[in-house]
């Protein structure tokens, strides 16, 4: 049975209550592209295109179609205030967004209502989702570096995939470069993120992530790094996975 916190919602084994509280404090900032969540707004177009294109390749859809994800069930784990849920709803997906922070879910619902979008937002954790529910696309974007038990968390994510589904994971590599750029640079020098947003020892290397996924009977089919160009002031997809990276996984043949 999940523990209940008035301010942060349900807590389960893989959830770190301190991480929930941290992002709850940012709930009012989620949709401000120049505020504390500006880094996510900057990187969001790349995340959206990567996920959309991976899904369209898997399900043989035309990525240029404005309804290319029509009929697909999508689960966004750790959805925050819906920065991914809204664009994928507009592309036709049936989106369920979950987050253990009640304040984040409230912010997400408010923004979706203002945008006239029907999104199923739930203040819950992946462990609390009915195991009979299945999804074509399961997303855990910038989440696993904030959970307590990565293997258990990924196991629950995998259990919610349809046999023909895909899982997308975005996280941060663990090395000296990610410490220098994602923590010292982003939190202390550039001040893109509040200090303490990330804990370097919770970062996950691509090899570790792939081993976890293989242990669940999944195979990585696509992967990409995300690299920031300070001269152009923009992010781009790159083979360089030293800091930020994303992977796509599906059931092994």
Swiss-Prot record:
Q: In which pathway does it act?
A: Cofactor biosynthesis; ubiquinone biosynthesis
GO biological process terms held by the UniProt record: methylation
| Residue numbers binding S-adenosyl-L-methionine | 47, 78, 99, 141
Q: Which residues form the signal peptide?
A: none
Print the keywords alphabetically. Answer: Methyltransferase, S-adenosyl-L-methionine, Transferase, Ubiquinone biosynthesis
Q: Which Pfam families match?
A: Methyltransf_23
Q: What class of enzyme is it?
A: transferase
From the UniProt record, list the reaction(s) this protein catalyses. Answer: a 3-demethylubiquinol + S-adenosyl-L-methionine = a ubiquinol + S-adenosyl-L-homocysteine + H(+); a 3-(all-trans-polyprenyl)benzene-1,2-diol + S-adenosyl-L-methionine = a 2-methoxy-6-(all-trans-polyprenyl)phenol + S-adenosyl-L-homocysteine + H(+)
Give the domain of life. Bacteria
The record's similarity note reads: Belongs to the methyltransferase superfamily. UbiG/COQ3 family.
Which PANTHER family does the record cross-reference, listed alphabetically?
Answer: METHYLTRANSFERASE, UBIQUINONE BIOSYNTHESIS O-METHYLTRANSFERASE, MITOCHONDRIAL
What is its biological role?
Answer: O-methyltransferase that catalyzes the 2 O-methylation steps in the ubiquinone biosynthetic pathway.
What name has this protein been given in UniProt?
Ubiquinone biosynthesis O-methyltransferase
- Read off the lineage from the record: Bacteria, Pseudomonadati, Pseudomonadota, Alphaproteobacteria, Hyphomicrobiales
């Amino acid at each position: 049975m999940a523990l209940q916190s008035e301010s942060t919602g349900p807590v389960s084994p893989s959830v770190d209550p301190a991480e929930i509280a941290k992002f709850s404090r940012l709930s009012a900032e989620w949709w401000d592209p120049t505020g504390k969540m500006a880094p996510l707004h900057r990187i969001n177009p790349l995340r959206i295109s990567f996920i959309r294109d991976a899904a369209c390749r898997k399900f043989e859809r035309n990525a240029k179609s404005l309804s290319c994800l029509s009929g697909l069930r999508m689960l966004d784990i750790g959805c925050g205030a819906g920065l991914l849920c809204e664009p994928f709803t507009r592309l036709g997906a049936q989106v369920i967004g979950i987050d253990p922070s009640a304040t984040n879910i409230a912010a997400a619902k408010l923004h979706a209502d203002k945008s006239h979008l029907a999104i199923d937002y739930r203040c819950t954790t992946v462990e609390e989702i009915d195991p009979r529910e299945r999804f074509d696309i399961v997303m855990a974007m910038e989440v696993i570096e904030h959970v307590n038990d990565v293997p258990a968390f990924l196991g629950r994510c995998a259990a919610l995939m349809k046999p023909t589904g895909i899982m997308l994971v975005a996280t941060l590599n663990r090395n000296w470069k990610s410490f220098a750029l994602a923590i010292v640079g982003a939190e202390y020098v550039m001040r893109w993120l509040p200090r303490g947003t990330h804990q370097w020892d919770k970062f996950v290397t691509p090899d570790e992530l792939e081993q976890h996924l293989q242990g669940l009977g999944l195979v990585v089919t696509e992967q990409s790094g995300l690299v920031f160009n300070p001269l152009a002031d923009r992010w781009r997809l790159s083979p360089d996975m030293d800091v930020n990276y994303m992977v796509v996984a599906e059931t092994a043949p």
